[in-house]
Amino acid sequence: TVAFGSCNYINEESVDRPGKGYGNGYEIYESIHAKKPNIMLWGGDNVYLREADWDSKTGIYHRYTHTRSIKELQPLLASTQNFAIWDDHDFGPNDGDRSFYFKYETQNAFKNFWANKTYGTDANQKEGIYSTFNWGDAQFFLLDDRFFKSPNDRLTGEKTIIGSTQFEWLIDALSSSKATFKIIVIGGQVLNPSARFENYQN
């Protein structure tokens, strides 16, 4: 059994925007744990970095530890294999892209908190959090839609979301996969033909 989830906003009043906080319903993690999944697959926005967090290693690690500390999440983290990708809010600013100046720090934090089996093309991979793993008769391909992404407002050059290195890695990995089921995980819309903001078509 594979459980999927994303958009894990944990309130912290001192750094949240005015008004009612976005986060609630944390008991969902207890419900997921009760189903005893073999894998929990986190589809991005697993933490929500705030404006106060982006500019420092201290802020980034505070956000991760604060998010991970809620009691409802502990049984799921302790008893289930967890794999993850990121999206904009755990990468950095809203709708973040490759121009984000602190992306290596957020990448390091991500790797420290998520024990994916591999990262990138080899053990020395320094850029991106894409990875793959096998489970039973399925192979999962976890893509990074932020580290290499072109800025939304860029007017020149060819735009990309996953970059050429990751794209070639994906094609090679899919071609050589012997798994019956191949599951691609990415933090944005891919099949929607409408060229809308933050859409693969766009």
PLM regions with names:
Residues T1-N202:
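Metal-dependent phosphoester/phosphodiester hydrolase catalytic core
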